[in-house]
């Protein structure tokens, strides 16, 4: 009789007031009838219209659950629950404990009211919970950070870590992937290729095993001095341009490594080459790109220097000999001022595609680097083979009816290595003028001194003579 009264009273109590959460949410504490869950009674669950059963949990001393894997630093304390269910009036109470996950099941689980602390439990768990093998074993899945290890689930209705970490969800560790050797690691503004191949970048290209380190505003070659280039260089894979048709110019892919043209363009050498020459190209006015316009040039015409000059004689001269070649693509038509014994400038056909790093060997001296942004010059060291210059077979035929000329806009400043003597001449002239002026000043002072001395002597003599004359005059009287 007492048991029936207790059952009726428990059924009438609202489910939301049957549990309370302590200040530290470690486990569930029931304030009414703590031993109600230990009674094996029939009809202690009320069937509902949706064919689900209402579960009630009794308190058991908390059992610590310690994770062996993952990154949780706190020990999760949970409460073991012995649930008794009676679906459709049948007592099938089966408490179980398992280590894996199971199929989802629909049930209504009695939970504690929500607390204000970040680690409190939710008032009502979702109706579909993954990790429950049957209706009699409600579980809460413990979050894990390692997805490769099978997650552990504890029989608990409250999971409250010591720290304020949320108890639901999946924490995925952000891993840093280090590329293997030979993989290009791209960053914003910098690209470092693996070996030798120059990869396009925004502002900076640094090859690992190449010969040029291109930075913003400065191109430093391997052996030949330092060349100040335009701000920014953007390069791409090397290629060839088909310029047989002036209206159709396409960039066809070729080798991905810079082409060495020292053996293809032999130039006779007649002296030592300048290795420390510095060429400075001003970029106050950007070079206008001639993309979309055919490059005018006489058909099958090659201009070569008539007489080779020495390095010293041509280091300060402006190169006027040009040659039109379109074997490698480039961005604009820019005459470059190399300092070699046989100066030669290659004016390449314009295109709007990014140009590759072309260390074209001219006459045993610096090469040319043309970009799509602004004028860029690059000097590379190389050895030119001795022999006559012959380029008639590789010349490109360009129609002579074009109305545009080679782009020569911009200001070019040639910096030579010869010593400048006008300053010394000016110093000598000023020194001579100073010496002459001081001499004249001293002479004038001496003249004034002599005149003053003579005047002083004459004054004394006049007084004596006056006295003598006066004496004689008085005596006569």
Curated annotation (Swiss-Prot):
Region feature (Disordered): 79-103, 239-366, 378-398
UniProt keyword list: Cell membrane, Glycoprotein, Golgi apparatus, Membrane, Signal, Transmembrane, Transmembrane helix
Stated name of the protein: Uncharacterized protein C11orf24 homolog
Ligase among keywords: no
Residue ranges annotated as Cytoplasmic topological domain: 449-477
Glycosylation sites (chain numbering): 40, 51, 77, 300
Parts of the chain on the Extracellular side: 19-427
Pfam families in UniProt: DUF5585
First and last residue of the signal peptide: 1-18
GO cellular component: a single term: Golgi apparatus
Bias (Polar residues): 253-288, 298-309
Topology of this chain in the membrane: Single-pass type I membrane protein
Main location as per UniProt: membrane
Record's compositionally biased regions (Low complexity): 85-97, 310-326, 348-361, 378-393
Location(s) in or outside the cell: Cell membrane; Golgi apparatus, trans-Golgi network membrane
Transmembrane feature ranges: 428-448
InterPro entries in UniProt: DUF5585, Erythrocyte_Invasion_ImmMod
């Amino acid at each position: 009789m007492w048991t029936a009264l207790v059952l009726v009273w428990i059924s009438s109590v609202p489910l939301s007031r049957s549990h309370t959460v302590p200040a530290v949410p470690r486990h569930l504490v029931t304030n009414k009838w703590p031993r109600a869950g230990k009674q094996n009674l029939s009809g202690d669950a009320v069937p509902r219209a949706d064919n689900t059963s209402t579960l009630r949990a009794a308190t058991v001393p908390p059992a610590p659950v310690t994770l062996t894997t993952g990154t949780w630093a706190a020990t999760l304390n949970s409460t073991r629950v012995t649930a008794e269910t009676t679906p459709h009036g049948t007592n099938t109470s089966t408490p179980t404990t398992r280590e894996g996950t199971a199929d989802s099941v629909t049930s209504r689980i009695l939970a504690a009211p929500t607390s204000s602390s970040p680690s409190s439990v939710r008032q009502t768990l979702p109706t579909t919970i993954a990790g429950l093998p049957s209706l009699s074993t409600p579980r809460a899945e413990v979050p894990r950070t390692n997805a490769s290890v099978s997650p552990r689930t504890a029989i608990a209705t409250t999971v409250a870590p010591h720290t304020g970490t949320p108890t639901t969800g999946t924490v995925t560790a952000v891993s840093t992937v280090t590329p293997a050797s030979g993989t290009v690691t791209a960053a914003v503004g910098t690209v470092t290729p693996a070996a030798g191949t120059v990869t396009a970048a925004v502002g900076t290209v640094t090859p690992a095993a190449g010969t040029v380190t291109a930075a913003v505003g400065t191109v430093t070659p391997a052996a030949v001095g330092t060349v100040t280039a335009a701000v920014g260089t953007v390069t791409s894979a090397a290629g060839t341009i088909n310029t047989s048709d002036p209206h159709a110019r396409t960039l066809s892919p070729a080798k991905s490594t810079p082409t060495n043209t020292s053996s293809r363009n032999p130039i006779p050498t007649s002296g030592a080459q300048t290795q420390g020459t510095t060429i400075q190209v001003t970029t106050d006015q950007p070079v206008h790109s001639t993309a979309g316009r055919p490059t005018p040039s006489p058909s099958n015409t090659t201009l070569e220097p008539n007489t080779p000059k020495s390095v010293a004689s041509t280091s300060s001269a402006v190169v006027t000999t040009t040659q039109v070649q379109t074997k490698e693509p480039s961005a604009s038509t820019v005459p470059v001022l190399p300092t070699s014994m046989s100066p030669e400038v290659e004016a390449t056909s314009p295109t709007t595609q990014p140009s590759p790093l072309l260390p074209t060997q001219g006459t045993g001296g610096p090469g040319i680097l043309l970009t799509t942004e602004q004028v860029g010059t690059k000097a590379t060291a190389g050895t030119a083979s001795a022999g006559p210059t012959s380029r008639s077979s590789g010349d490109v035929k360009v129609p002579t009816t074009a109305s545009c000329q080679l782009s020569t806009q911009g200001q070019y400043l040639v910096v030579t290595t010869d010593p400048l003597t006008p300053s010394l001449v000016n110093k000598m002239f000023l020194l001579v003028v100073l010496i002459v002026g001081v001499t004249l000043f001293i002479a004038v002072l001496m003249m004034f001194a002599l005149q003053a001395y003579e005047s002083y002597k004459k004054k004394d003599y006049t007084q004596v003579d006056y006295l003598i004359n006066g004496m004689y005059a008085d005596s006569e009287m």
